[in-house]
Amino acid sequence: MVAEQGTPKRLHFDFVGAVLWLVRILAILAVVIGAFVSLTSGRLSAAAWLNFVVIGIGQGAIYALIALGYTMVYGVLGFINFAHGEVFMSGAMVGAFAANSLAQAGMWNSSPILSILIVLLIAMATSTLVALLLERVAYRRLRNAPRLIPLITSIGASFFIQYAFLGLFGAQTRTYPALSILDGFISVAGLNIRYADIMVIGAAVVMMVGLYTFVERTKAGRALRAVAEDKEIAALMGVNVNRTIVLTFAVGGAMAGAAALLFGVVFRTVFFFSGFLFGIKAFTAAVLGGIGNIVGAMLGGLTLGIFESVGPSLVLTGLGIPSAHQLKDVVAFLALVLVLIFKPTGLLGERLSEERA
């Protein structure tokens, strides 16, 4: 069959792709212009910028610990547990109650290390228990359901936990008592580092290294990775899939509980809705690092924390936007949008198969 000579070829124009490229270019220009104006204005010293970075690392460490729960559950079960922010909130709320009880008993500042360890164990135990209840009651029967079903269930579970804690603790804000040993800062080459940031960063690093070692070096960790790779083959190899899934929720809950204590010690206030905002930010961190990748969650949390701390002064102020630091939450959510536009797989993520997506 001979093709007709005079038939013109149809040109296909990808309108959505063109818009995305335009958004990419505008975003890069905005960041470059804002950063250039801020850095050349001399408004802040180098030490001030470094202070922003240190504060961002401290915040990012908390995001990273919470993000681990999102990424571990996704890696094993393939769905996003949007109730994980409330797992974090439950540990923070009960931790505040425990911390105030210790303060009334005179232990909080007289024996600060012991008090922190006690509240840490209580917060981790609470968050772990809530995570295990979620797995048992809300998700276990939905393991073979379409991915949309457990996703919707997790949103419902999130609201249920929020209002359960509203009924238990009321709508008022709970405050952690001040910890005298964390007052003040240390000066290093003109850089003022708060003791609270040192504690948060140090504790988070220890826990993240411990988790990485657990996943990579232990038999239970190898089982977890095997189930994440393929449940059926893992079961044929003798791995107890059900127990491994329960362990995944338990570990994610424990990390969220640890983050809850660090959050309480640094920010000091918590209420029944606190888990929503921090949960969304931690989810953003997981996506930024590559959802399903444990190291990616850690890296994503730290990156988001620094971006949220430095971004308003570096970019927004340079663009002439007033009260830039009041927009740090906007910066965090903007980061999620930009990641989804520029690199949907995240920093360390891999392109998903159709089955997992």
Model-based region annotation:
Residues 48-99, 133-149, 286-294:
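Single transmembrane alpha-helix segments in multi-pass membrane proteins
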Residues 59, 192-271, 294-300:
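Helix-loop-helix "hairpin" substructures at the membrane interface of multi-pass membrane proteins
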Residues 54, 76-133, 269, 313-321:
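Membrane-embedded helix boundary and interhelical linker motif in transport proteins
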Residues 13-14, 141-217, 244, 310-329, ...:
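Transmembrane helix-bundle core of multi-pass membrane transporters
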